[in-house]
Curated annotation (Swiss-Prot):
The lineage of its organism: Bacteria, Pseudomonadati, Pseudomonadota, Gammaproteobacteria, Aeromonadales. It comes from Tolumonas auensis (strain DSM 9187 / NBRC 110442 / TA 4). This is Exodeoxyribonuclease 7 small subunit. The gene is xseB. NCBIfam families: PRK00977.1-1 (NF002137), PRK00977.1-4 (NF002140), xseB (TIGR01280). Pfam families: Exonuc_VII_S (PF02609). Belongs to the XseB family.
Length: 88
């Protein structure tokens, strides 16, 4: 697979490529040098994906601040398990 410029990939493309790399590494059939290159590529993709998620989170917070004057609360996993973020 030709190495694409990591920063220019969309989040979905980076995640898809990362999933393929994980599958290849889990199979354990790659030669050591190839596995190391794939691991390095995976780290790059994971970092870029994390940055894109953080940027999206910031955009959502900005949009919420513009739309409402209420206090924003950080998203936590507990809020998705039946608790409402407005119940504080």
């Amino acid at each position: 697979m030709a190495a694409k410029k990591t920063e220019s990939l969309s989040f979905d493309a980076a995640l898809g490529e990362l999933e393929q790399i994980v599958q290849q590494l889990e199979q354990g059939d790659l030669p050591l040098e190839t596995a190391l290159k794939q691991f390095e590529r995976g780290i790059q993709l994971a970092r870029v994906s994390k940055q894109k998620l953080e940027q999206a989170e910031q955009q959502v917070q900005i949009l919420l601040q513009q739309g409402e004057q209420e206090k924003l609360t950080p998203f936590t996993v507990e809020q998705t398990s039946g608790q409402n973020a407005e119940e504080e």
